[in-house]
């Protein structure tokens, strides 16, 4: 049988969000003014998938290392769950949580 299967951008955004939130130090996804699904934007240009995540992180985390871990986890998750290879996974840290009390 011939045909095509398509996975909606909303589903891909949910996968990316779930993967990002698995990383230690990621506190939440941050919604912005541009339309995106709970802090995640998926673009699909002729089958080329790009992911942009806007995150809030915990105080004191190593932001570059956390961002790299999110990129890896999201790319692996999309490959495993949707059989897609993202051309890019961009991580934007928009918020840092407050320092712990007494710090």
Predicted segments with their positions:
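N-terminal presequence-like segments and adjacent domain-start helices
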Residues: 1-18
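Hydrophobic C-terminal alpha-helix "anchor/cap" residues
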Residues: 16, 20-21, 78
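Short, well-ordered secondary-structure micro-motifs
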Residues: 18, 64, 99-103
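Short edge beta-strands and adjacent turn/loop segments
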Residues: 23, 27-56, 88, 93-96
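Active-site acidic-Proline motif in GNAT/NAT acetyltransferases
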Residues: 59
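Short, non-transmembrane amphipathic alpha-helical segments
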Residues: 63-82
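Short, charged, intrinsically disordered terminal tails
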Residues: 79, 83-86, 94-103
């Amino acid at each position: 049988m011939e045909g095509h299967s398509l996975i909606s951008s909303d589903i891909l955004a949910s996968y990316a969000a779930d993967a990002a939130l698995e990383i230690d130090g990621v506190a939440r996804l941050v919604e912005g003014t541009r339309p995106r699904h709970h802090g995640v934007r998926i673009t699909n240009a002729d089958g080329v998938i790009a992911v942009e995540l806007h995150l809030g992180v915990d105080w004191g985390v190593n932001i570059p290392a956390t961002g790299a871990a999110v990129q890896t986890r999201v790319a692996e998750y999309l490959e495993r769950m949707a059989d897609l290879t993202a051309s890019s996974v961009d991580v934007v840290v928009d918020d840092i949580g407050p320092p712990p009390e007494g710090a």
